[in-house]
């Protein structure tokens, strides 16, 4: 018990993050199923026509999935576990800071769940816009609890980000220059910079909201000379980099997986790195594309349309580099590779709808419809989550030291693939038809597509239950694995090449035995 409470070992903390993320994923998935069941048919289904309750569920679904599932799993879990190992460091730069970064999250989650139980809950949507989040519309403590929850999770992420930046800059092994870093380490590094620059703005925005609610200030109240649009600018200045924080570690994981199962290095390594940095920088220059509908100046809208479309360029560079890596490789279609290929295909679709939504004139019609929901679930529910599953199947043999059942893994992939596409593809049509977000009832005309969408969500739940069984199966029935479970014997060579230098994996974690020892490196490795 003490080992896990007081642990300063990056691997232990990474494991805690991953367990926490699985727990949060169950809660978030439960919320999403409630949403889809309520929308399965027109009229009242399960929530007794309680629109406030519906919005509380929507809000909780978003917060749990973003702050307690994707970020802890990608940045906290895989980041903590793999970054020190990949750069040849004995641990993170600030191990005890790492410990508190994790332990701030459970209280934060408890605060968020508690907010649903006081008064009527926080039914603001994850954006928490005033005046809906103000004292008139949400009297009682629920929004305040949600704000404190965000504060804690934000502090956790910022401390973690400082830790990652320091670690990557100062603790690389001899010979590992920045231009030799594995792409996943680059991804976490860029993500940490984004976190460090964007979260303080969110903290300021929600702190001013807190004082508006409790201490009679009027930052967002026009009656006292404030402006609710100020909140939107501050929130989205954080909110847009945030969505790149969610996807960039996924880029890094997919690069490793595609490289390993194509049997060759990633095409255009340096281009990949600069593409990630460009995406990160541009992410701070496009926030108002979430606000085309609030009456921005026409020149402002023109700028944000153009800037948003420019983000598609580095993103396209990454997509085509992955395709070039695949092209001519000796492909092995394993479970992680399936998830990586699914990621590339579905992320591209999500990116295309993003370019469509970038157009201010079009977005005025599509804003706050299910078209937007479909867009960001294609990049998150099939981008970030598929990358996470790919990373799970790719690195779990290394982390736990046991294999998973390949057939079950493939069934998991195909079930989930069918489920998420059934869920979210019809939502494009609903959005084009004008069905608004965050409303638990809708006209009969939308019934058919909603029924299909809700059925898809049940398919996804089946896939998720299967994943739970797969975790059990690994722990109980998994066979022990070698240092590199993905190695292939090199034919026509006197030396078994995968002992010397593997074609299937080039980063340092595959040089250690599986499961990775508690102290990774007794002597620092040296990279030529």
From Swiss-Prot:
Gene that this polypeptide is encoded by: COX1
Name listed for the protein in its UniProt record: Cytochrome c oxidase subunit 1
Family: Belongs to the heme-copper respiratory oxidase family.
Species of provenance: Mycosarcoma maydis (Corn smut fungus)
Binding site for Cu cation: 240, 289-290
Record keyword DNA repair present: no
Cited function: Component of the cytochrome c oxidase, the last enzyme in the mitochondrial electron transport chain which drives oxidative phosphorylation. The respiratory chain contains 3 multisubunit complexes succinate dehydrogenase (complex II, CII), ubiquinol-cytochrome c oxidoreductase (cytochrome b-c1 complex, complex III, CIII) and cytochrome c oxidase (complex IV, CIV), that cooperate to transfer electrons derived from NADH and succinate to molecular oxygen, creating an electrochemical gradient over the inner membrane that drives transmembrane transport and the ATP synthase.
Entry superkingdom: Eukaryota
Pathway note: Energy metabolism; oxidative phosphorylation
NCBIfam families, sorted: CtaD_CoxA (TIGR02891)
Main subcellular localisation: mitochondrion
């Amino acid at each position: 018990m003490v080992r896990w409470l007081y642990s300063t070992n990056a691997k232990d903390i990474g494991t805690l993050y991953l367990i926490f993320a699985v727990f949060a994923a169950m809660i978030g998935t439960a919320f999403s199923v409630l949403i889809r069941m309520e929308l399965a048919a027109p009229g009242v289904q399960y929530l007794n026509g309680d629109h406030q309750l519906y919005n509380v569920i929507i809000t909780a679904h978003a917060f749990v999935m973003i702050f307690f599932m994707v970020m802890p799993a990608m940045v906290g879990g895989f980041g903590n576990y793999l970054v020190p190992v990949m750069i040849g460091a004995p641990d993170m730069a600030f191990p005890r800071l790492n410990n508190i970064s994790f332990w701030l999250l459970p209280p934060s989650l408890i605060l968020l769940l508690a907010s649903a139980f006081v008064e009527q809950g926080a039914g603001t949507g994850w954006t928490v816009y005033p005046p809906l989040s103000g004292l008139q519309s949400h009297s009682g403590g629920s929004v305040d609890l949600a704000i404190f929850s965000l504060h804690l999770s934000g502090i956790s992420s910022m401390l973690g980000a400082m830790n990652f930046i320091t670690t990557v800059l100062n603790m690389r092994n001899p010979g590992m220059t920045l231009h030799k870093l594995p792409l996943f380490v680059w991804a976490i590094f860029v993500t940490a910079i984004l976190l460090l620059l964007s979260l303080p703005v969110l903290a300021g925005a929600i702190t001013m909201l807190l004082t508006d609610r409790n201490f009679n200030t009027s930052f967002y109240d026009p009656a006292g000379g404030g402006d609710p649009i100020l909140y939107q600018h501050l929130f989205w200045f954080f909110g847009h980099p945030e969505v790149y924080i969610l996807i960039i570690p996924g880029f890094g994981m997919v690069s490793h997986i595609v490289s390993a199962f194509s049997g060759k290095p990633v095409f255009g390594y340096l281009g990949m790195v600069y593409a990630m940095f460009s995406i990160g920088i541009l992410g701070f220059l496009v926030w108002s594309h979430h606000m085309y509908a609030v009456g921005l100046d026409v020149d402002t809208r023109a700028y944000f349309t153009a800037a948003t479309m420019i983000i598609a360029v580095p993103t396209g560079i990454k997509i085509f580099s992955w395709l070039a890596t695949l092209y001519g490789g000796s492909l092995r279609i394993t479970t992680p590779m399936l998830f990586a290929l699914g990621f590339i295909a579905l992320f591209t679709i999500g990116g295309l709808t993003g370019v469509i939504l970038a157009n201010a004139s079009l977005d005025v019609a599509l804003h706050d419809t299910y078209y937007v929901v479909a867009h960001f679930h294609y990049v998150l529910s099939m981008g970030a989550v598929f990358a996470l599953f790919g990373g799970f199947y790719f690195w779990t043999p290394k982390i736990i030291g046991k294999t998973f059942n390949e057939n079950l893994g493939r069934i998991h992939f195909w079930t989930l693939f069918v489920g998420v596409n059934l869920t979210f593809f019809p939502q494009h049509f609903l959005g084009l038809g004008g069905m608004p977000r965050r409303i638990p009832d809708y006209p009969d005309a939308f019934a058919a597509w909603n029924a299909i969408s809700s059925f898809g969500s049940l398919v996804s739940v089946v896939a998720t239950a299967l994943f739970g069984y797969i975790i059990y199966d690994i722990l109980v029935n998994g066979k022990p694995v070698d240092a590199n479970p993905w190695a292939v014997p090199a034919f026509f060579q006197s030396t078994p090449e995968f002992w010397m230098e593997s074609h299937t994996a080039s980063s340092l974690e595959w040089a250690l035995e599986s499961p990775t020892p508690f102290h990774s490196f007794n002597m620092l490795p040296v990279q030529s």
